Amino acid sequence: SGLKKIDDKTVEVSFTELGQGVYTGGNGLIASALPEHHLKDIPIKDLEKSERVRSKVLTLGAYTIVSNVQGESLELKANPYYFKGKPKIEKATVEVVNSNTVVSALKTGKYDIAIRIPTDLYKSYKDLNNLEILGRQELYYSYMAFKVGKFDKVKGENITDPNAKMADLKLRQALAYGLDVEQMVKAFYYGLRERATMAVPPAFKKYYSKDIPGFPYNPEKAKQLLDEAGYKDVNGDGYREDKDGKPFEVRIASMAGGDIAEPLVQFYIQQWKEIGIKAVLSTGRLIEFNSFYDKVQADDPEIDVFFAAWSVGTNLNPIEGGGRKSPFNFPRFASDENDKLMAEISSPKTLEDPNYKAEAYKKWQEYYINQALEVPLTYRYEIFP
């Protein structure tokens, strides 16, 4: 079966084949076991509502469930059979709290810790003297991406269009250099973000490279690149025309939600105005979350550039978000060089040498970041008051 009992708390698992993600996150291996004797008689369709899943739970974890009020609260008690020993805290209560009231609850000391509290509330509680605020970098990055092609559903692959509006490399690089991300972070995020340079946060020390600078703010370089690419202001109105001297504008797609969504996109528009590029909102407004991704994935012709974010998994295989055949390669970029560099990241050599994948990943990032297709903007910190 591939399973071997070593002792009462240890099982050895043998595999006939392993993937390249084994060194970073287990390659999707299940990290917990389910008790067959406890669940085998429950039909799959009834599992979610079963009390053996919702309240009378057998678990390997430090706590067991006492009661569960769906969408409201969870009562926990220490598990005396936990493999590290019974926890010293006997019980815990987890409550779902409206973001409008969580800060006032923190002020009164009602809760010992708040998890997943919106970062835009940070300013309202950061100076409270009854809190100690901890934080860590999330496995996340926000980015700006340019549409350079379409996804061919028949062929099942991304087709890059050399005549797409955003196909010019120097144009994309100029727009990347034209955004002052450092200023944006200070103005909108209270220090809870920092400028990103790669599609992997520094938390992955082995894969992150300080030698890849990304696109630090450089408006003069941006203007130079636009001049070289043939985008020049021919009528003196402050905005550059395209290579043929015709009016040129970049259509932005950005998501609605939160107090800073609108000011943030206006910041982008103003920044690009300063290098002579006219930018407007696609659809004339911010786009609701689900509609936004529907439009992006459908390659809506009204979108030239969009602002979004990725959660970063531990597998660190970029083929899902940047591969030739991936529907989630939203810029729709494909090239032989990209294929070659990505293939090395999942090469069998990664299993022979734990360092091989990290070096292959950095080589791919050097190439891909320079293409300015999906430009990393910020890394984010999650906080625990």
Report the location of each language-model feature.
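Surface-exposed binding/hinge segments that line
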Residues: S1-I42
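Extracytoplasmic/peripheral linker and loop segments enriched in polar/acidic and small residues
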Residues: G2-K4, D8, A164, L169-Q173, ...
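Bilobed periplasmic-binding protein-like "clamshell/Venus-flytrap" ligand-binding domains
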Residues: Q20-G26, K186, A229-M255, I303, ...
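Gly/Pro-rich hinge or "lid" segments in bacterial periplasmic/extracellular proteins
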Residues: G28-P87, K91, T101, P219-Q224
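Ligand-site clamp/hinge motif
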Residues: E51, N79-S124, K278-V280, R285-I287
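Append "and occasionally in soluble cytosolic enzymes with long acidic Gly/Pro-rich linkers
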Residues: K77-P80, K165-Q270, E274, E337, ...
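A bilobed periplasmic-binding-protein/Venus flytrap-type ligand-binding module shared by bacterial periplasmic
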Residues: K77-P80, Y141-K170, A187, I212, ...
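Acidic-aromatic pocket-rim loops
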Residues: R136-G156, N290-K349
